[in-house]
Amino acid sequence: MLARALLLCVALALGHAANPCCSNPCQNRGVCMSVGFDQYQCDCTRTGFYGENCSTPEFLTRIKLFLKPTPNTVHYILTHFKGVWNIVNSFPFLRNAVMKYVLVSRSHLIESPPTYNAQYGYKSWESFSNLSYYTRALPPVADGCPTPMGVKGKKELPDSKEIVEKFLLRRKFIPDPQGTNMMFAFFAQHFTHQFFKTDPKRGPAFTKGLGHGVDLSHIYGETLDRQHKLRLFKDGKMKYQIINGEVYPPTVKDTQVEMIYPPHIPEHLRFAVGQEVFGLVPGLMMYATIWLREHNRVCDVLKQEHPEWDDERLFQTSRLILIGETIKIVIEDYVQHLSGYHFKLKFDPELLFNQQFQYQNRIAAEFNTLYHWHPLLPDTFQIDDQEYNFQQFLYNNSILLEHGLTQFVESFSRQIAGRVAGGRNVPAAAQKIAKASIDQSREMKYQSLNEYRKRFRLTPYKSFEELTGEKEMAAELEALYGDIDAMELYPALLVEKPRPDAIFGETMVELGAPFSLKGLLGNPICSPDYWKPSTFGGEVGFKIINTASIQSLICNNVKGCPFTAFSVQDPQLSKAVTINASASHSGLDDVNPTVLLKERSTEL
């Protein structure tokens, strides 16, 4: 009887079909809802489409689709016709109109309030209210699907170590054709670690960055306790120390702030800053020092303007000003460089004041994943006339003191970074991080590359060759994954063919830009009630924000005002080496595979 009952249970289990939403039948951002065990419904509400699978466009949608150019066409227009864009840039009303279109068209791709997280693939109060989760652009692959990507591809995904070694690991350094430099690379790492703070104890779906945006917690600390330990409580300033006549962060001993340093690091080199991991490399501590100096400089400006203000108001207002400076630098210098546009991007919150726009943000897990730009890192770091490998560079603040900030800025402004797209450019020192990125994406059950392309209104790739733009890697990827609709998001972003003379491929830009711009303009200081001079201490503070740039940040805080930018100024440097990512493994053995990067987080 027991055996017969067990057989009956097995038969019933096998008789149940897979979740009908496993095949992602609902198109154009329609929401799939199972009905019973083998039926589904697509909710097409406000998608502009109708039909069983939300695949038939409404009349107005059909017109919009006919008139709307493809993302690659838009990119081509914005990166060519320089004379036309010079005219647009010189007329404020034209520049404002284009910038408004850029902001609205990008930010509307991000759902606000947030909808899903790793635990909930459907809308729930928990997924909205629990700030300890990263949100999700797409829900996780449904439970019980025939394959890891739903219904497409093989029953098991290929070994992540094999993916890294075959397609991601560097054979020979491939420089970025856009000329991106190490000032950019370390700015990216420093800036994003105020909101990419995966909780290693709870797993990749969780974050310790509860501010979910540009809150400068990497400068001031995530908690009030950490902030208070870092503050001087005089004139609004942060604690500091003077070394060789210059301002540097205080030590762990002086602040009792927890930082991550190996045991052998001497006390006087254990600098304490807002982010506990910023002792990892001197490039991060360089920016931490610059922003510390900037905060205290702004406090001096406000103190002169408002001698009646107490320490708390000077501190809080200076923080708001630095948030504004950060957003302006990110849009007008950082994103401007990445875009390659001849159109000049503009930070002007007033452009959105008559739009439906929510001044809140939630960091998405996919945004965190796509920001793993480890191919930017070179094999060695060149500072003045010295060269440091990873082993010499990690946890070595003595390099910062030995050379000083001026030499750091000058050297990193000259050193070119690596190309991110195109494959085979992750340095050996970061291969374990790349593997962990793939493993964690699988743990969080990300949908396929093509599902994310559809979510962000891109045409799905029809083949691996279309994805990579070449034949060798495409054939190997097809053998491992079996179907282009089963290709994973993270490795796809790194092997995708770059746009012409660009650092990224199409998917990285078209997914990353909406997350980025929504996060920046969704900041409370950009809202109508905040964006006014009185918020920032009057016209003096407002002017600091509105005139901020990466160059002014350096000039105000680094001795000698060294020239800087986010790209090398000699265009020949970026053209010096032409490398095919499908080349042989030559040069790989020259890299020491024992280099120790912190494995506690894939974000470093």
Curated annotation (Swiss-Prot):
<dbReference type="InterPro" id="IPR010255">
    <property type="entry name" value="Haem_peroxidase_sf"/>
</dbReference>
<feature type="disulfide bond">
    <location>
        <begin position="26"/>
        <end position="42"/>
    </location>
</feature>
<feature type="disulfide bond">
    <location>
        <begin position="555"/>
        <end position="561"/>
    </location>
</feature>
<dbReference type="InterPro" id="IPR000742">
    <property type="entry name" value="EGF-like_dom"/>
</dbReference>
<comment type="pathway">
    <text>Lipid metabolism; prostaglandin biosynthesis.</text>
</comment>
<keyword id="KW-0560">Oxidoreductase</keyword>
<keyword id="KW-0256">Endoplasmic reticulum</keyword>
<keyword id="KW-0644">Prostaglandin metabolism</keyword>
<feature type="disulfide bond">
    <location>
        <begin position="21"/>
        <end position="32"/>
    </location>
</feature>
<feature type="active site" description="For cyclooxygenase activity">
    <location>
        <position position="371"/>
    </location>
</feature>
<dbReference type="GO" id="GO:0046872">
    <property type="term" value="F:metal ion binding"/>
</dbReference>
<feature type="glycosylation site" description="N-linked (GlcNAc...) asparagine">
    <location>
        <position position="580"/>
    </location>
</feature>
<keyword id="KW-0472">Membrane</keyword>
<dbReference type="GO" id="GO:0020037">
    <property type="term" value="F:heme binding"/>
</dbReference>
<feature type="disulfide bond">
    <location>
        <begin position="44"/>
        <end position="54"/>
    </location>
</feature>
<feature type="disulfide bond">
    <location>
        <begin position="22"/>
        <end position="145"/>
    </location>
</feature>
<dbReference type="GO" id="GO:0019371">
    <property type="term" value="P:cyclooxygenase pathway"/>
</dbReference>
<feature type="active site" description="Proton acceptor">
    <location>
        <position position="193"/>
    </location>
</feature>
<feature type="site" description="Aspirin-acetylated serine">
    <location>
        <position position="516"/>
    </location>
</feature>
<dbReference type="GO" id="GO:0005737">
    <property type="term" value="C:cytoplasm"/>
</dbReference>
<dbReference type="GO" id="GO:0005637">
    <property type="term" value="C:nuclear inner membrane"/>
</dbReference>
<dbReference type="GO" id="GO:0001516">
    <property type="term" value="P:prostaglandin biosynthetic process"/>
</dbReference>
<comment type="subunit">
    <text>Homodimer.</text>
</comment>
<keyword id="KW-1015">Disulfide bond</keyword>
<feature type="binding site" description="axial binding residue">
    <location>
        <position position="374"/>
    </location>
    <ligand>
        <name>heme b</name>
    </ligand>
</feature>
<feature type="binding site">
    <location>
        <position position="341"/>
    </location>
    <ligand>
        <name>substrate</name>
    </ligand>
</feature>
<dbReference type="GO" id="GO:0150077">
    <property type="term" value="P:regulation of neuroinflammatory response"/>
</dbReference>
<feature type="glycosylation site" description="N-linked (GlcNAc...) asparagine">
    <location>
        <position position="53"/>
    </location>
</feature>
<dbReference type="Pfam" id="PF00008">
    <property type="entry name" value="EGF"/>
</dbReference>
<keyword id="KW-0492">Microsome</keyword>
<keyword id="KW-0408">Iron</keyword>
<keyword id="KW-0223">Dioxygenase</keyword>
<dbReference type="GO" id="GO:0005789">
    <property type="term" value="C:endoplasmic reticulum membrane"/>
</dbReference>
<keyword id="KW-0643">Prostaglandin biosynthesis</keyword>
<dbReference type="InterPro" id="IPR050783">
    <property type="entry name" value="Oxylipin_biosynth_metab"/>
</dbReference>
<dbReference type="GO" id="GO:0016702">
    <property type="term" value="F:oxidoreductase activity, acting on single donors with incorporation of molecular oxygen, incorporation of two atoms of oxygen"/>
</dbReference>
<keyword id="KW-0443">Lipid metabolism</keyword>
<feature type="glycosylation site" description="N-linked (GlcNAc...) asparagine">
    <location>
        <position position="396"/>
    </location>
</feature>
<comment type="similarity">
    <text>Belongs to the prostaglandin G/H synthase family.</text>
</comment>
<keyword id="KW-0732">Signal</keyword>
<comment type="function">
    <text>Dual cyclooxygenase and peroxidase in the biosynthesis pathway of prostanoids, a class of C20 oxylipins mainly derived from arachidonate ((5Z,8Z,11Z,14Z)-eicosatetraenoate, AA, C20:4(n-6)), with a particular role in the inflammatory response. The cyclooxygenase activity oxygenates AA to the hydroperoxy endoperoxide prostaglandin G2 (PGG2), and the peroxidase activity reduces PGG2 to the hydroxy endoperoxide prostaglandin H2 (PGH2), the precursor of all 2-series prostaglandins and thromboxanes.</text>
</comment>
<dbReference type="GO" id="GO:0043005">
    <property type="term" value="C:neuron projection"/>
</dbReference>
